[in-house]
């Protein structure tokens, strides 16, 4: 389970699903789900449903800012990191200069950290700089597509 002050385990979805089956409760799978094969795999391993987040970041209807959208397609970004540096609670995003510098010393403390970094993030977004703001993205960000959300969801559900 996710608790705001707990360091996320980093276990892959398939490992979490295998362990969760023992509890006999409905499980909503999330994390690393970016295509129909991942949906099929999660459902086949016992998930009752699948939730996506990153898969919709480039949807036409998403509120993803232009700096974030460009970064999701920019080859300079090669990895993700789980950090609390932007908001004071853990979330996964593209590794950038801000995470490299501040993640090692970032305190937990949402919403205070989020409020303190808000003006910084707004300024660097206005300047078009992807290295001073959060670029939320999951591990499968390279597999996501742009287009209408309905088309993205239809592609995810293609085999069901």
PLM segments and residue spans:
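Conserved active-site-proximal phosphate/metal-binding subdomains
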Residues: 1-26, 34-160
């Amino acid at each position: 389970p996710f608790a705001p002050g707990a360091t996320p385990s980093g276990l892959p979805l398939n490992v979490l699903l295998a362990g969760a089956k023992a509890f006999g409760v409905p499980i909503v799978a999330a994390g690393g789900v970016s295509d129909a094969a991942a949906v099929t795999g999660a459902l086949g391993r016992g998930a009752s449903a699948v939730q996506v987040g990153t898969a919709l970041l480039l949807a036409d209807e998403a509120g993803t800012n232009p700096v974030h959208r460009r970064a999701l397609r920019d080859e300079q970004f090669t990895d993700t990191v789980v950090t609390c540096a932007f908001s004071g609670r853990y979330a996964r995003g593209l590794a950038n200069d801000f995470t490299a510098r501040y993640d090692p010393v970032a305190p937990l403390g949402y919403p205070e950290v989020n409020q303190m970094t808000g003006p910084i993030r707004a300024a660097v977004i206005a300047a078009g700089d992807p290295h001073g703001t959060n670029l939320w993205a999951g591990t499968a960000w390279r597999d996501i597509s742009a287009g209408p959300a309905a088309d993205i969801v239809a592609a995810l559900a293609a085999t069901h």
